[in-house]
C-alpha cells in the first residue's frame, strides 16, 4: 500500500517536511549555488530507486554521474537502469521533455515513484527578456508538472535559483508568485560558513521557520 509521502533519502529532511515528499504535489528547494540542492535531488532519486521504483530526472545544469555514483554506492549501475534522464538544452526543450515524461509515467518498466527537475529555472533565465511571456511559459511548465503529479500519484521535486528582491529587500526564488503558489512545500537552503542550513518556508501543515544545519558529504549530507 502506498504511503502519502516519499522519502528524500534523509531523515532530517523527511522530518522537516512532515514525513517526506508529498505525493500529488510539488516540493521546491531554492538557494544559492553549491548550497546542496542537487545533492538532495540525487539523494531522493536514489532512495526511490532503492525502493524498487523508477525516477524521471530532468536536469538542466549538467547531470553528474560521479555524484550519483557517490550517493548510490556500489549498486549505482543497477539503480541507474531505472533512472530516466532528460537533459534539455533550452527552455523550449524543457517544455517538450516535461510532456515526453508522461510516456514513461504510463509505460515505464518499473512504476515511476518520483519526478525531479533540477533546476526548474536555469533555462528560464535565458527567456527573461521576453517579460510576461517568460513567466507564462514557466507557469505552463509547472502546471504540467503538477498535473503529472496528481494524475500519477507521485511527488515532484524541483530546485530553483535565487535573486535579490529589491522591493522586499530579501533573497527570493525565481519565477514569481506563480511558482511559489504552485509549490505546496518550499525549503530554502543557505550557506553558513562550512555548513548549510535548511529552512522551511512554506508547508500546509508544518510551521514556517523550522530549520536544521547540515554539511555536504561524499555520500549525501550529515546533520550537525
From Swiss-Prot:
GO MF annotation, one: damaged DNA binding
GO biological process: DNA recombination; DNA repair
tRNA-binding found in the keyword field: no
Pfam families (alphabetical): Rad51 (PF08423)
Keyword DNA damage: yes
Keywords: ATP-binding, DNA damage, DNA recombination, DNA-binding, Nucleotide-binding
Domain of life: Archaea
InterPro entries: AAA+_ATPase (IPR003593), DNA_recomb/repair_Rad51_C (IPR013632), DNA_repair_and_recomb_RadB (IPR011939), P-loop_NTPase (IPR027417), RecA_ATP-bd (IPR020588)
NCBIfam families, per database record: recomb_radB
Function: Involved in DNA repair and in homologous recombination. May regulate the cleavage reactions of the branch-structured DNA. Has a very weak ATPase activity that is not stimulated by DNA. Binds DNA but does not promote DNA strands exchange.
UniProt record similarity statement: Belongs to the eukaryotic RecA-like protein family. RadB subfamily.
HAMAP family reported in the protein's UniProt record: RadB
Name used for this protein in its record: DNA repair and recombination protein RadB
Lineage of the species this protein comes from: Archaea, Methanobacteriati, Methanobacteriota, Stenosarchaea group, Methanomicrobia
